Amino acid sequence: MALLQKTRIINSMLQAAAGKPVNFKEMAETLRDVIDSNIFVVSRRGKLLGYSINQQIENDRMKKMLEDRQFPEEYTRNLFNVPETSSNLDINSEYTAFPVENRDLFQAGLTTIVPIIGGGERLGTLILSRLQDQFEDDDLILAEYGATVVGMEILREKAEEIEEEARSKAVVQMAISSLSYSELEAIEHIFEELDGNEGLLVASKIADRVGITRSVIVNALRKLESAGVIESRSLGMKGTYIKVLNNKFLIELENLKSH
């Protein structure tokens, strides 16, 4: 397959990912097929975002690492000492992706390290490994282009997380601001009683203790439920089951108390 055709296949990853959740496993599989090597997409903290194996490595430690989806801490830290593509590192390199305890088996193992950069910062590392065949210039062009595409997707995912965070916070603030003073007071007592994200409460008991009517509690819960902040379900004589759906709610409630 020609270099241009392989480049187009990598490019299609971007088009396929548009508007969908990022799938690093599929990206790793695509890179495995066009570069013909084992592929590991590793985050800044060593989390294995995606991987695809071309040549199986029979080693218990490696298997556990793939199951846990986590690279060793020291290895991850050392990757930051590689500021640019470093190719064809042998089994004796500290950056080898082959198990050094089986050095004899993987004597011909070669590793290439490609930093994933985006927005001017190091986002992670693309690690490629294969047995015997050296990584040629065409492989490195594809690896660096692949790392750029992965970097763009990591940035997109980060931006979406920030956007979702802001949206969740805004929904909570609007829901809380819609409560009257007595409703807000009722809600504070309810979640003190729950002491967590979900639980059972008896509205009449809280109403008696705080000195408010039961209808105030019901109205407050209804407002939060219609905003999608909580869900509540009546369990008859047992009381009302409440679950927090928006993880920003309890934080905002705590902030209100401290002011």
From Swiss-Prot:
Residues 1-155 are annotated as: GAF domain. DNA-binding global transcriptional regulator which is involved in the adaptive response to starvation and acts by directly or indirectly controlling the expression of numerous genes in response to nutrient availability. During rapid exponential growth, CodY is highly active and represses genes whose products allow adaptation to nutrient depletion. Its main location: cytoplasm. HAMAP family: HTH_type_CodY. Coiled coil: none annotated. The gene is codY. Signal peptide: none annotated. GO terms for biological process: negative regulation of DNA-templated transcription. This is Global transcriptional regulator CodY. Keywords: Cytoplasm, DNA-binding, Phosphoprotein, Repressor, Transcription, Transcription regulation. Belongs to the CodY family. Residues 203-222 bind DNA. Pfam families: CodY, HTH_CodY. GO terms for cellular component: cytoplasm. GO terms for molecular function: DNA binding; DNA-binding transcription factor activity; GTP binding. The modification Phosphoserine is found at residue 215. The keyword Transport does not apply. It comes from Bacillus velezensis (strain DSM 23117 / BGSC 10A6 / LMG 26770 / FZB42). It is found in: Cytoplasm.
